[in-house]
């Protein structure tokens, strides 16, 4: 579900945290991908005709494999290094949300049958999308596919987005690709949206910078988490009458949900029962994840062409020529991708000490006077500092 209205709130109140970029600008980047969310999207969109999903001759659904194979191939061709992270066991806090989803899916199935009886094609497509359910088999098939493609797979203890955020915070990956904005709430420094969008949609890739978002919103980390909980998340109900704008106002005024509740008029803003905002805050701040140091080394290997043909063509009835062509493009671009980005060959230097800033102004005057006296005859100067890539001798 993500965080209700967070994208718009950031666009209106922290526009500097959003940057549009091009797909190819992520060349050489390691990107953690929320696998479960994207598999669901593939099931909803890829190859759909009315209420019919893409299937093979045996009637087995293949929409998830079609989407996963060709979108992943596109990233690999562009030199992007994806690592797919799959959901583990849902946290206890999410049980109510999952129960609601099951109920909504049942309602959608009932509405779908009525739409079929009425011959309402628009309603048929609408409710069939709402009734989609990703099974363990779909996930396992995608894991098999990715391993055949030479792409690493990570299985999260609980939420994939929390695991992705851990990997991004530690520097194991550049950022995480998802459409759910609660990745920022989990602490991901950089969230990438629309990376998996089909080219036909012509949607620009967006990067969200968490540090800039907090700075422009003028919120601390804890306040940002409380803001997201108030706006609506998977782990806690919402307070009727408090939307995104009012949530931001209240967090800025009271500093926290706890402080807000002490002064809230329950007649005007009824608080649901239960309202596990403290537990939700703790889960966002300290989710159950595998520490990056304990994740096996991420390796991107050459695709197993014959293994992919066996799986996709012989078992799932994919077009063999399309599969082989995609594998050929991946192999052709693998050497280029392995060269990496230019900045990966440079080591960042520590920032210079700032203790001199506290020295008396008299010392500054003496230094300036000395520079003025000897500057004209000194050799080197600014020109001597110019390196191979320009001023400073390095290129970021």
From Swiss-Prot:
Binds 2 magnesium ions per subunit. They probably participate in the reaction catalyzed by the enzyme. May bind an additional third magnesium ion after substrate binding. Its EC number is 3.1.-.-. DNA binds at residues 71, 159, 232, 234. One of its GO terms (molecular function) is 5'-3' exonuclease activity. GO terms for cellular component: mitochondrion; nucleolus; nucleoplasm. Residues 123-254 are annotated as: I-domain. Interacts with PCNA. Three molecules of FEN1 bind to one PCNA trimer with each molecule binding to one PCNA monomer. PCNA stimulates the nuclease activity without altering cleavage specificity. This is Flap endonuclease 1. It comes from Chlamydomonas reinhardtii.
